[in-house]
Amino acid sequence: LWSKLFNEYMVAYGEAMDNSVSRTNRVFIDGGDRAEQINFVRQQLTSNRPSWHRMMVEKGIPERLKPLEELSRNLWWCWTVAARDLFESVDAELWVKVDRNPIALLDKLSSTRCEELCNDTEFLKQMDAVYKEFTEYMSEKPSPEHAKVAYFSMEYGLHSSLKIYSGGLGILAGDYLKEASDRNVGMVAVGLLYRYGYFTQRLSAQGAQEATYEAQNFFKLPIMPVRDEFGNWVTTQVAMPGRTLYARVWKCQVGRTDLYLLDADYEANLEEDRQVTYYLYGGDWENRLKQEILL
């Protein structure tokens, strides 16, 4: 039924459009003993053309559970036992499935479970206690008398959900940021935001080692675009031979420590330059050099 209806609809619609255009192409005005023909310029029918726009759809959670959202956006939770336990208690099975990523956890949480949590007095009490600890922690600011510290590293091992590290150096750098936060040191860190991060290894059916990469969805990570007072995405740039390399700036909250991550994978760059922030320690020597220059 629908296939017949649709086909007939398209035929009728086409005839209607043809008749409409033929009527608007020429108009005759009676002027005494003759008819004056006025030609009109056919205008483009823009109303029948799709207009594509990018949009982000974010799942909202009940107002009573908003503290969970704020906690998920700051990596303070990952080295605070009470906060980790809080997220696990939201849905223990789902917590494991999303690799202990609280942002992904809240995104996949069902409305039924949200309603249950809103009516769970013990859970709400636990959440309020953790959130109070967090807000008190964040309210303490570094002394203005202390020197500011700028920390640069190719990798930061902060949590497994943020794949911008490979091993020892990254874990050490991540621990520096966490310790700086706990000691209330005025530190600002800078690194690169890798689209694919570092490879993981697996064995093929023949027993050979294979490297696999998985693209990160930046909007499912504890990072946010840095914007200026006009709402524009803050960028930085570096001169390269015959061109300019651009990088967008993202911000990751590591407790009280701000970590700024540079991302070259967007339309302003040539394809070869977009690959600068594809892989940690990936690509040829020239790409490695570009990474160092950008940082």
What does each of the following model-derived ranges do?
Residues 1-3:
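A short, well-ordered alpha-helix in the C-terminal region of glycosyltransferases
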Residues 6-295:
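Catalytic cores of carbohydrate-active enzymes across secretory and cytosolic contexts
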